[in-house]
């Protein structure tokens, strides 16, 4: 067994993870003649329902604010036992019950429950991530935080410090990691690692940073992969943009000290209308694009071992990126196509690494031209590599990297990415297709130096003086790790903060 326990924190993270779990559910096979390429025990846990029937549910811990779960109930059909009547002797007076009007399940959920043809999902009828979820969750997976309300205008959950303070308060009362996470970890025979979905441009970045710091006390050597999601900026005020920038700076600096690998993901600000038909105001749409990349990049960690597929593990993937031991931050790119042999001009290419400020494609191209690659992981799903893909330093499966050398690991799988009825139709070139060919590239390279230094400079003028030195030093140390030929005695480091 090589189990992965997943942590989901926040609304956009839960949208993204819902797409992830829908994809995992689609890989189940129900015929003895049909063998799955996926080892379902990696992400799913066996159990017993209230009626004694066997269940197989996601091994995940989910957090969201009050109102964030939509119509999803903590007790579902698999665990719904008859409630016992309360002993009347406890209270002899008259009882008054106040109930909030329950949220009506989406038409899609109602059709799934009825076993009928699924209703069509649109941006207008997907109100919550639970509206398009195709899986059941264990009651212990669902944790609602009542101190803040989703989309509140009076007290929005939007500052990094609010997240750290909320975690500190709740942890004093309950010991969150022990209450919520440990039961899932203790079920594992040989835990492969922890996968974290979180936003990094709001208060969830602070909450997650504190949560992982607590986890590190109990799991000091466990591999932790953190997917740091960022919401589209859209038409928000300058003050809100600056707040998100500061949150991102704090989150990256803190998460990189607690995680084995941190991968920030944000949609490019450039127009993608020629290849992607997307409503950026819809988290159902934006999360779908990021989920496809995450699900593909981590595919080797759940492939069936011993099959013709190239199985990997989270620690091997992390080791291939963090070549020098101090490079936890990685960038992510994705290429999606209708067919295996699709030419380059028909592929949909997305660069998710948008840390700091808006970068033009021309500027990114200049950085990429001169970059030195420390580690790179290419994951192909029924897609032929293009001729210019990096071959230098390529490692065969199972081969260990050598410190100081460029490392390139490639994984190939015939398993295409499923385009389910719960997945939005955002790829015009794939209209009518039930699946897609895909490639992701995870990379640690020298272009990250300038990105982090820019983030450091821009955030320094926006944070209080008492935070500036620690944040600046942390980001400077992180940037230096990606400078080709850097050594601890270098005098090139700037000390302007």
Swiss-Prot record:
GO terms for cellular component: mitochondrion. It is found in: Mitochondrion. GO terms for biological process: mitochondrion organization. This is Protein DML1. The keyword Nucleus does not apply. The gene is DML1. Pfam families: Misat_Tub_SegII, Tubulin_3. Belongs to the misato family. The keyword Mitochondrion applies. Involved in the partitioning of the mitochondrial organelle and mitochondrial DNA (mtDNA) inheritance. Keywords: Mitochondrion. InterPro entries: Beta-tubulin_BS, DML1/Misato, DML1/Misato_tubulin, Misato_II_tubulin-like, Tubulin/FtsZ_GTPase_sf.
